[in-house]
């Protein structure tokens, strides 16, 4: 569901098909132009506690249309209020998505290329991600690990 301003108030401006079973949810990753066409895509992990897929949508009128999906992600810790366990980052001039794997033990670097989500890198971690991923500079982020925050440069993890 995409919320926007409509006649001076907030309103639903677009939505996707239902994600399935009741009481399931998704955790947004980013709204960003992933393919360089000047239009923003919406990325989210569906059912993050179940190691769900990362999906990318684009707004087409009042619909969010699914463009691509890739399985095996989790960007939320059950019971936590922290929702920022993933983020977009420009690496080598190209937008990428930083999203933990299903066990939150590796940080996957994902590109949207030719209409597909593709893993272009993976960073091994000393302990599971339990806190926010935050930008420090154009090249570095801090990752909230169970053992404490870690400074890293995701570009160093590209394949």
Residues of each region from the PLM?
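Beta-propeller-forming repeat regions
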Residues: 1-159
């Amino acid at each position: 569901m995409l919320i926007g301003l409509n006649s001076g108030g907030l309103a639903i401006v677009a939505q996707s098909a239902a994600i399935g079973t009741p009481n399931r949810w998704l955790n947004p990753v980013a709204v960003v132009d992933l393919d360089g066409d000047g239009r923003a895509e919406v990325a989210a992990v569906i059912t993050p506690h179940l190691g769900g897929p990362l999906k990318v949508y684009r707004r087409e009128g009042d619909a969010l249309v699914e463009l691509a999906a890739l399985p095996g992600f989790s960007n939320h810790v059950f019971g936590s209020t922290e929702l920022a366990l993933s983020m977009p980052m420009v690496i080598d001039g190209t937008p990428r998505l930083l999203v933990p794997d299903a066990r939150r033990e590796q940080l996957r670097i994902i590109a949207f290329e030719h209409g597909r989500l593709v893993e272009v890198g993976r960073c091994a971690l000393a302990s599971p991600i339990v806190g926010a991923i935050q930008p420090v500079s154009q090249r570095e982020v801090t990752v909230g690990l169970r053992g404490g925050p870690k400074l890293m440069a995701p570009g160093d993890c590209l394949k």
